[in-house]
Each structure stands twice: as C-alpha cells, then as structure tokens.
C-alpha cells in the first residue's frame, strides 16, 4: 500500500518555498477561540443549517376551541421538524448546560478562594440541572406522552 502512495511523488517534486506568516496575522487568545467555539456550538445545536435549508416560520399557530389563533413555539409530534424559536430555546439550554460543566471544571482551580469556589459550584450545578430538566420539559412539549413512565 505504501508503494501506491509513493507513485505520485516519483513524478511530482515539492517546491523549495520559504513562506513566512504575514505580520498582521496574530495568534488569537484562548478566550477568543473559546467564544468562537461556543457561538458555533449554539448555532449548530439550534439547527441553523435546518433553518436555512427549510426556512420554517419562527413560531406556529394553532386554532383553539373558540376559533381563535393561538401562537405555539413547539412543533408537536414532529421530531424531524422545528420552529426557529424552538431551535433557539433548545440551543440556549444545551449551551447553558455545557457552560455549567465548564464552570464546574473552573471551580477546581487551586488558587480560588472558598466563597468563590462555592459560588462557582452552585452556579455550575444550577446551569447543568436547569438545562437537563428544561430539556425534559421541552421533550414533553414536543412529544406528549414521551418519558411518562
């Protein structure tokens, strides 16, 4: 197999280039990269690709027993479809849970005072638990009867 990889390089020869990095290109800080990762995670879990391709409405509507239109944020009984607000709300919860885990990890640093450590642990646990239980509530709104024991 290695001989097959060698065949193109018998004909091709790498040029002798001396490339330098442009002076205006700087290494981004860790927080800049982290912010880009969190924003991209928010957009991807929110279904931005689905929203661009399918172009769903931001919220839906359902007719009640009196004939009035009532807005709904969740497209019930459809796992493979969503409204834009539904995707953004779910994405916010997923991102909040992920940030909760990161806050819990940051509370482990050795130089944090005891009160700050307690506050970080509390905020981290609240973020993780709130996002978990709200995701379960969203699933019950999306699929009534699901996860009902």
From Swiss-Prot:
Stretches in topological domain Cytoplasmic: 1-32, 105-117
Chain segments annotated as transmembrane: 33-53, 84-104, 118-138
InterPro entries: OligosaccharylTrfase_OST3/OST6, OSTC
Record flagged with keyword S-adenosyl-L-methionine: no
GO biological process: protein glycosylation
Entry keywords, A to Z: Endoplasmic reticulum, Membrane, Transmembrane, Transmembrane helix
Extracellular face residues: 54-83, 139-149
Any Gene Ontology CC annotation: oligosaccharyltransferase complex
Subcellular location: Endoplasmic reticulum; Membrane
Task performed by this protein: Subunit of STT3A-containing oligosaccharyl transferase (OST-A) complex that catalyzes the initial transfer of a defined glycan (Glc(3)Man(9)GlcNAc(2) in eukaryotes) from the lipid carrier dolichol-pyrophosphate to an asparagine residue within an Asn-X-Ser/Thr consensus motif in nascent polypeptide chains, the first step in protein N-glycosylation. N-glycosylation occurs cotranslationally and the complex associates with the Sec61 complex at the channel-forming translocon complex that mediates protein translocation across the endoplasmic reticulum (ER).
Assembly notes: Component of STT3A-containing oligosaccharyl transferase (OST-A) complex. STT3A-containing complex assembly occurs through the formation of 3 subcomplexes. Subcomplex 1 contains RPN1 and TMEM258, subcomplex 2 contains the STT3A-specific subunits STT3A, DC2/OSTC, and KCP2 as well as the core subunit OST4, and subcomplex 3 contains RPN2, DAD1, and OST48. The OST-A complex can form stable complexes with the Sec61 complex or with both the Sec61 and TRAP complexes. Interacts with PSEN1 and NCSTN; indicative for an association with the gamma-secretase complex.
Identification of the protein by name: Oligosaccharyltransferase complex subunit OSTC
Organism, scientific name: Bos taurus
